[in-house]
């Protein structure tokens, strides 16, 4: 009621999409516990799973779709980005997409590539999914990882006119990106995302042209350039 007064709100959750975690156990947890909260669940899906396994995931009450991720191609304890340059179809293959389309299921897509959504292969493959599997509810996470305005211009603008493509704004803090998305996509196809538990930390983000830096007062591996205690004391929740 504080954030969305007078509106009915439903949350959607899923497990941790990394092979260092128990994928099957996390899926079972979300479809067991989320319906009791009247939340929707997404199942984390391994790219190696056959069509029948995806069918089985979607048969559970409350499971409305899947969460694929390129890190599920193979485990590397040193980096989640070993497969960042993969094709979308390397971690969400066509036989799974066929099942998802038949069920009119939801897919939250964290796009690969260091160049983010604007990479030509991502643009081509998103359009291919939309053409071949039009009944999938395709949601592009983090505005296609568009954390800076140049990335948003390259990634969002070529796809913004597709009325069947949806977006979430989780982890996007740049007001210029939000303004661009509101202007070219509009509020009807943008969903609010928290990216929790990641963004339950306190901190702030700085950006300059195409680069950005996350700062936090917590001892995360990436937090090597700490700001002064006086600045950190003023951090808010991401």
Regions found by a protein language model. Give the residues of each.
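Catalytic domains of carbohydrate-active enzymes, especially glycoside hydrolases
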Residues: 1-15
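Glycine-enriched alpha-helix->loop->beta-strand junction motifs that scaffold or abut catalytic
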Residues: 60-65, 102-106, 132-137, 158-166, ...
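Well-ordered, non-membrane alpha-helical segments in soluble/globular domains
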Residues: 1, 23-32, 86-95, 120-126, ...
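Distinct, well-ordered alpha-helical segments
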Residues: 23-28, 51-58, 78, 116-132, ...
């Amino acid at each position: 009621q504080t954030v969305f007064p007078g509106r009915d709100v439903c949350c959607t959750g899923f497990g941790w999409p990394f092979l260092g975690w128990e994928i099957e156990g996390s899926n079972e947890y979300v479809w067991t516990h989320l319906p009791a909260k009247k939340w929707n669940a997404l199942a984390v899906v391994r790219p190696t799973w056959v069509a029948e396994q995806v069918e089985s995931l979607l048969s559970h009450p409350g499971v409305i779709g899947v969460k694929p991720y390129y890190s599920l191609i193979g485990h590397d304890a040193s980096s989640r980005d070993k497969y960042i340059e993969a094709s979308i179809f390397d971690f969400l293959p066509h036989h799974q997409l066929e099942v998802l389309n038949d069920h009119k299921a939801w897919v939250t897509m964290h796009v690969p590539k260091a160049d983010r959504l604007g990479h030509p292969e991502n643009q081509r493959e998103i359009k291919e999914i939309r053409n071949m599997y039009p009944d999938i509810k395709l949601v592009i996470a983090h505005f296609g990882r568009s954390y800076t305005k140049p990335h948003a211009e390259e990634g969002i603008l070529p796809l913004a006119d597709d009325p069947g493509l949806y977006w979430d704004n989780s982890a996007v803090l740049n007001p210029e990106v939000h303004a661009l998305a509101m202007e070219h996509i509009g509020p009807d196809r943008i969903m609010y995302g928290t990216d929790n538990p990641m963004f339950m930390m306190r901190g702030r983000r700085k950006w300059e042209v195409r680069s950005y830096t996350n700062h936090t007062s917590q001892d995360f591996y990436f937090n090597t350039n700490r700001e002064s205690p006086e600045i950190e004391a003023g951090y808010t929740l991401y």
